C-alpha cells in the first residue's frame, strides 16, 4: 500500500514506530497536491515551508518519546473559516483577502497539541454560505470522484482534499450540513458533533446557534480519533460543554446488537433519487443483519426545516457579518467620498452575490413588522423539531437516512437555481436545528460511480452510538 492510501491513524502508527518519517508523510501529501491541485482546487492557501519546519520539530519530539499522540506527525488541512495565527484566513471572501489572524482557533490548537502538521487552508463557499463550494471568491473546487461535479459545501475543499489524498484528514464546519453533505458527495466520512462539543472560538461565525466544527476523514476510526482530539471544554466559548464522555475511539470496540434504529418515512418521499433510497435502505439492512432492530417511523415537522433554517441562519448571519466593514482589517474600497459611502462600497465590492442575498434576507426577517411573522415563527419551528427528535429518541437509539436527495450535481447547476442548492441540505439541516450529532458514511455508488452517503443521527451526547453503528457497517461492507 502506498503511503498516501493510509488512513490518519495508520500513518500515525507507522510514524510512532519509526517506520515512516514525518517529512515522508508531508512529501506524500505535497506530491498529490502538486499532481492534482490545479484541477481540483481544494486549497486557498498552502503553508509548505512552515509545515516542513514543524515536521522537523515534531520528529525530534516523537523520537525522544515526548509526543505520543495517535495523530502525531499526520498532515491535516483546515477549512479557511478557522483562524490560524500568521496564516491567511479568508473565509473564501474578497473582504478578508488580506486577513492574517493574530491567534489560532481552539480546535486547531487542540490538533497542534496532538502533534498535527497543518499543511494549508481549504476552499469553501464564501462565509460558509452554500452547498457546492462554487461561491468562493477564489474559484470553484471540483469533486475528485468526477471533476465535472461539485464536491458539496460549504466544506467542499476539506472533503475534496481528503478524497484526493491531498491530506490525511481535515477540519470542516457544519451549520446546516456543511460537513456531512460534502462528505457524502466525495465518498468520505464526516461528523457534526453535538452542539457545544467542539469549541467555536476562532471560527468565523455564520449562524452562531447552529455552527459546529468537526472532522472529515478517510474512515470511521479516523473520524473518531480526530473528534476525540478536538473535543474539550473551552472557557473562551460561552456555548462550550464540559463533557466527560469524549473517548470516542473506545466506542469502536462495541457492535450494534440490540440497538434500536429508526428510519424516518418522511426522508424517503418525493424528490429522493431511487438509487440513493435503495442504497441507504440496503445499508440499514446490513445493520439489521448485524443485530440491530430496524423499523420505519414518522418524524414530525421535518418538512419545515428548510424555511426555519434559512430564516434563523440568515438572521444570525446578517448580524455576524456586520463586523466586516474595512475599518480595522480586511478589504477596503479605494474610491469613496465619506464614511457611509466607504461602508457601502466596501461591503458591496467585498461580499459575493450569495452572501449579499443572505444578508438581505436576514435583515428583512429581523426588521420591524416582520420579526414575529418570520424569525419568531422559525424559532418556534426549531423547538418543534427538537421536540420531534426527543420523542423519536425516546423510542430509538439511532436514526438513519440519506445525506442528500441525489449524488453530486454537475458544476454550475445549483448556481443557476439557488433553490436546488438550498434543497441539497434538506436531510442534514434538522440535526443543526435540534443540536444533535450526525455522521455521513459512504454506503454505495450510483450508476455513474458517484458516492452515495448514509446519515446516522444520535441523540445529544450519543456520538458513541453513532460511531458503533458506522464502524460496524464499515467493517462489514468495507470502503466504497
How should each PLM-predicted stretch be described?
Residues 1-52, 289-291, 479:
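An N-terminal boundary/leader segment
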Residues 18, 79, 219:
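Short, conserved phosphate/pyrophosphate- and ester-handling motifs at nucleotide-, phospho-/glycolipid
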Residues 25-29, 308-309, 355-363:
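Short alpha-helical scaffolding segments that buttress acidic/His motifs in well-ordered protein cores
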Residues 29, 51, 104, 223, ...:
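Residue-level signal for inorganic ion chemistry
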Residues 35, 164-169, 173-271, 277, ...:
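Structural helix-boundary/capping segments
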Residues 71-91, 250-262, 315-386, 437-453:
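Short helix-loop capping/hinge segments that flank enzyme active sites or metal/cofactor-binding pockets
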Residues 72-213, 264-266, 315, 401-419:
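Short glycine/serine-rich loop/turn segments
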Residues 94, 98, 239-244, 334-341, ...:
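Short, surface-exposed loop/helix-turn segments at secondary-structure junctions
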